[in-house]
Protein backbone atom coordinates (compact mmCIF):
# COMPACT_ATOMS: atom_id res chain seq x y z
CA UNK A 1 0.00 0.00 0.00
CA UNK A 2 1.15 3.60 -0.59
CA UNK A 3 1.92 5.98 2.25
CA UNK A 4 -1.05 7.58 3.98
CA UNK A 5 -3.43 4.84 2.84
CA UNK A 6 -6.81 4.85 4.57
CA UNK A 7 -8.84 1.87 5.75
CA UNK A 8 -12.36 1.91 7.17
CA UNK A 9 -14.98 -0.35 8.70
CA UNK A 10 -18.69 0.39 8.48
CA UNK A 11 -21.56 -1.28 10.29
CA UNK A 12 -25.16 -0.59 11.31
CA UNK A 13 -23.96 1.24 14.43
CA UNK A 14 -20.77 2.60 15.92
CA UNK A 15 -20.50 -0.10 18.57
CA UNK A 16 -20.47 -2.88 15.99
CA UNK A 17 -17.96 -1.03 13.84
CA UNK A 18 -15.69 -0.69 16.87
CA UNK A 19 -15.91 -4.44 17.40
CA UNK A 20 -14.06 -4.82 14.12
CA UNK A 21 -11.43 -2.41 15.43
CA UNK A 22 -11.14 -4.47 18.62
CA UNK A 23 -10.71 -7.71 16.65
CA UNK A 24 -7.94 -6.12 14.55
CA UNK A 25 -6.28 -4.77 17.68
CA UNK A 26 -6.31 -8.17 19.37
CA UNK A 27 -4.96 -9.87 16.25
CA UNK A 28 -2.08 -7.40 16.02
CA UNK A 29 -1.19 -7.70 19.70
CA UNK A 30 -1.27 -11.49 19.40
CA UNK A 31 1.11 -11.43 16.42
CA UNK A 32 4.51 -10.26 17.70
CA UNK A 33 6.25 -10.70 14.35
CA UNK A 34 3.73 -8.28 12.82
CA UNK A 35 3.25 -5.92 15.75
CA UNK A 36 6.95 -5.27 16.36
CA UNK A 37 10.12 -5.08 14.26
CA UNK A 38 13.56 -5.02 15.85
CA UNK A 39 12.04 -4.12 19.18
CA UNK A 40 9.99 -1.20 17.83
CA UNK A 41 6.21 -1.23 17.82
CA UNK A 42 5.00 -0.64 14.28
CA UNK A 43 1.36 0.06 15.16
CA UNK A 44 -0.15 2.83 17.23
CA UNK A 45 -3.46 1.59 18.59
CA UNK A 46 -5.86 4.25 19.83
CA UNK A 47 -9.54 4.16 20.72
CA UNK A 48 -10.69 5.70 17.44
CA UNK A 49 -8.01 4.53 15.01
CA UNK A 50 -5.04 2.27 14.36
CA UNK A 51 -1.97 3.66 12.61
CA UNK A 52 0.76 1.71 10.83
CA UNK A 53 3.66 4.00 11.65
CA UNK A 54 6.18 3.04 8.91
CA UNK A 55 3.76 4.19 6.18
CA UNK A 56 1.48 6.50 8.18
CA UNK A 57 -1.53 4.51 7.00
CA UNK A 58 -4.62 4.59 9.19
CA UNK A 59 -7.62 2.42 9.94
CA UNK A 60 -10.76 4.10 11.32
CA UNK A 61 -14.01 2.44 12.46
CA UNK A 62 -16.86 4.62 11.19
CA UNK A 63 -20.18 5.11 12.92
CA UNK A 64 -23.11 4.61 10.57
CA UNK A 65 -24.47 7.69 8.89
CA UNK A 66 -26.84 8.41 6.03
CA UNK A 67 -24.90 11.42 4.79
CA UNK A 68 -21.41 11.74 6.31
CA UNK A 69 -19.39 8.99 4.65
CA UNK A 70 -18.57 10.71 1.38
CA UNK A 71 -15.13 12.16 0.76
CA UNK A 72 -13.26 9.12 2.12
CA UNK A 73 -10.53 7.46 0.06
CA UNK A 74 -10.48 3.86 1.29
CA UNK A 75 -7.76 1.58 0.02
CA UNK A 76 -9.87 -1.10 1.68
CA UNK A 77 -13.08 -1.21 3.66
CA UNK A 78 -14.98 -3.82 5.63
CA UNK A 79 -18.77 -3.59 5.86
CA UNK A 80 -20.13 -5.87 8.57
CA UNK A 81 -23.72 -7.05 9.21
CA UNK A 82 -24.77 -5.42 5.96
CA UNK A 83 -28.18 -7.07 6.19
CA UNK A 84 -29.02 -4.72 9.06
CA UNK A 85 -28.10 -1.54 7.18
CA UNK A 86 -31.21 0.53 6.38
CA UNK A 87 -29.84 1.57 2.98
CA UNK A 88 -26.87 0.85 0.72
CA UNK A 89 -25.49 4.38 1.24
CA UNK A 90 -22.52 3.35 3.40
CA UNK A 91 -21.35 0.73 0.89
CA UNK A 92 -21.86 3.00 -2.10
CA UNK A 93 -19.96 5.82 -0.37
CA UNK A 94 -17.01 3.50 0.25
CA UNK A 95 -17.04 2.20 -3.33
CA UNK A 96 -17.30 5.72 -4.77
CA UNK A 97 -14.31 6.83 -2.72
CA UNK A 98 -12.21 4.08 -4.29
CA UNK A 99 -12.54 5.41 -7.84
CA UNK A 100 -8.91 6.59 -8.06
CA UNK A 101 -7.44 3.96 -5.72
CA UNK A 102 -5.12 1.26 -7.06
CA UNK A 103 -5.58 -2.28 -5.71
CA UNK A 104 -8.88 -1.30 -4.10
CA UNK A 105 -10.53 -3.88 -1.89
CA UNK A 106 -13.88 -4.20 -0.13
CA UNK A 107 -15.29 -6.87 2.19
CA UNK A 108 -19.04 -7.26 2.63
CA UNK A 109 -20.08 -9.59 5.45
CA UNK A 110 -23.44 -10.54 6.89
CA UNK A 111 -25.79 -13.25 7.98
CA UNK A 112 -29.33 -13.31 6.67
CA UNK A 113 -32.00 -11.04 8.13
CA UNK A 114 -35.79 -11.52 8.29
CA UNK A 115 -36.52 -9.36 5.25
CA UNK A 116 -35.24 -9.53 1.71
CA UNK A 117 -35.33 -5.75 1.35
CA UNK A 118 -31.83 -4.89 2.58
CA UNK A 119 -28.44 -4.04 1.01
CA UNK A 120 -26.95 -7.46 1.69
CA UNK A 121 -29.54 -9.24 -0.43
CA UNK A 122 -28.72 -6.85 -3.26
CA UNK A 123 -25.05 -7.84 -3.00
CA UNK A 124 -25.93 -11.55 -2.84
CA UNK A 125 -28.19 -11.27 -5.88
CA UNK A 126 -25.42 -9.59 -7.87
CA UNK A 127 -22.87 -12.21 -6.79
CA UNK A 128 -25.20 -14.97 -7.96
CA UNK A 129 -25.58 -13.29 -11.33
CA UNK A 130 -21.79 -13.28 -11.67
CA UNK A 131 -21.56 -16.92 -10.61
CA UNK A 132 -24.30 -17.86 -13.08
CA UNK A 133 -22.60 -16.00 -15.92
CA UNK A 134 -25.39 -13.44 -16.27
CA UNK A 135 -23.11 -10.58 -15.25
CA UNK A 136 -19.37 -10.36 -15.89
CA UNK A 137 -17.12 -9.18 -13.06
CA UNK A 138 -13.71 -10.77 -12.63
CA UNK A 139 -12.99 -8.58 -9.59
CA UNK A 140 -15.68 -10.23 -7.46
CA UNK A 141 -15.05 -13.15 -5.13
CA UNK A 142 -18.01 -14.42 -3.12
CA UNK A 143 -18.50 -17.11 -0.50
CA UNK A 144 -22.23 -17.75 -0.17
CA UNK A 145 -23.25 -20.28 2.45
CA UNK A 146 -26.91 -21.12 1.87
CA UNK A 147 -28.80 -24.43 2.00
CA UNK A 148 -30.06 -25.85 -1.28
CA UNK A 149 -33.37 -26.81 0.32
CA UNK A 150 -34.92 -24.79 3.15
CA UNK A 151 -38.19 -26.64 3.66
CA UNK A 152 -36.98 -29.54 5.83
CA UNK A 153 -34.74 -27.59 8.21
CA UNK A 154 -36.18 -29.45 11.22
CA UNK A 155 -34.91 -32.83 10.04
CA UNK A 156 -32.41 -32.33 7.23
CA UNK A 157 -28.88 -31.98 8.64
CA UNK A 158 -27.66 -30.78 5.25
CA UNK A 159 -29.37 -27.43 5.86
CA UNK A 160 -27.03 -26.71 8.77
CA UNK A 161 -24.02 -28.29 7.09
CA UNK A 162 -24.29 -26.13 3.98
CA UNK A 163 -24.90 -22.97 6.00
CA UNK A 164 -22.08 -23.68 8.46
CA UNK A 165 -19.23 -25.49 6.68
CA UNK A 166 -16.94 -24.95 9.66
CA UNK A 167 -19.14 -27.44 11.52
CA UNK A 168 -17.73 -30.15 9.24
CA UNK A 169 -14.35 -29.64 10.89
CA UNK A 170 -15.26 -28.70 14.48
CA UNK A 171 -17.54 -31.19 16.25
CA UNK A 172 -18.32 -28.78 19.09
CA UNK A 173 -19.90 -26.32 16.66
CA UNK A 174 -21.99 -29.07 15.10
CA UNK A 175 -23.21 -30.23 18.51
CA UNK A 176 -24.15 -26.66 19.43
CA UNK A 177 -26.04 -26.19 16.17
CA UNK A 178 -28.08 -29.33 16.82
CA UNK A 179 -29.00 -28.03 20.28
CA UNK A 180 -30.04 -24.69 18.79
CA UNK A 181 -32.16 -26.46 16.17
CA UNK A 182 -33.90 -28.58 18.80
CA UNK A 183 -34.68 -25.44 20.80
CA UNK A 184 -35.99 -23.63 17.72
CA UNK A 185 -38.26 -26.57 16.93
CA UNK A 186 -39.66 -26.55 20.46
CA UNK A 187 -39.85 -22.76 20.92
CA UNK A 188 -41.47 -20.98 18.01
CA UNK A 189 -40.21 -17.54 19.05
CA UNK A 190 -36.61 -18.77 18.67
CA UNK A 191 -37.01 -19.81 15.04
CA UNK A 192 -36.41 -16.45 13.42
CA UNK A 193 -32.99 -16.05 15.04
CA UNK A 194 -31.97 -19.66 14.42
CA UNK A 195 -33.04 -19.75 10.78
CA UNK A 196 -31.65 -16.36 9.80
CA UNK A 197 -28.41 -16.42 11.80
CA UNK A 198 -27.49 -20.10 11.74
CA UNK A 199 -29.14 -21.45 8.59
CA UNK A 200 -29.02 -18.33 6.38
CA UNK A 201 -32.71 -18.70 5.60
CA UNK A 202 -34.95 -15.66 5.29
CA UNK A 203 -37.75 -16.38 7.75
CA UNK A 204 -40.81 -14.19 7.51
CA UNK A 205 -41.76 -14.31 11.15
CA UNK A 206 -43.31 -16.10 14.08
CA UNK A 207 -46.59 -17.84 13.35
CA UNK A 208 -46.37 -17.65 9.58
CA UNK A 209 -44.12 -20.65 8.88
CA UNK A 210 -43.39 -18.95 5.59
CA UNK A 211 -39.99 -19.19 3.95
CA UNK A 212 -38.93 -16.89 1.18
CA UNK A 213 -37.03 -18.42 -1.69
CA UNK A 214 -35.00 -15.52 -3.06
CA UNK A 215 -35.15 -17.10 -6.52
CA UNK A 216 -38.90 -16.47 -6.50
CA UNK A 217 -38.69 -12.79 -5.57
Give the residues covered by each predicted segment:
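Walker A/P-loop NTP-binding motif
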Residues: 1-2
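Short coil/turn segments at beta-strand junctions that form active-site/ligand-binding loops
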Residues: 5, 72-74, 104
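Conserved Walker A/P-loop ATP-binding site and its immediately adjacent core
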Residues: 5-26
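Structural motif
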Residues: 8-10, 76-78, 107
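Glycine-/small-residue-rich active-site loops that bind phosphorylated ligands and cofactors
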Residues: 15-16, 66, 85
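Inter-Walker segment of RecA-like/P-loop motor cores
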Residues: 20-75
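Walker B catalytic acidic pair
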Residues: 80-84
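Non-catalytic, compositionally simple segments
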Residues: 88, 93-95, 100-217
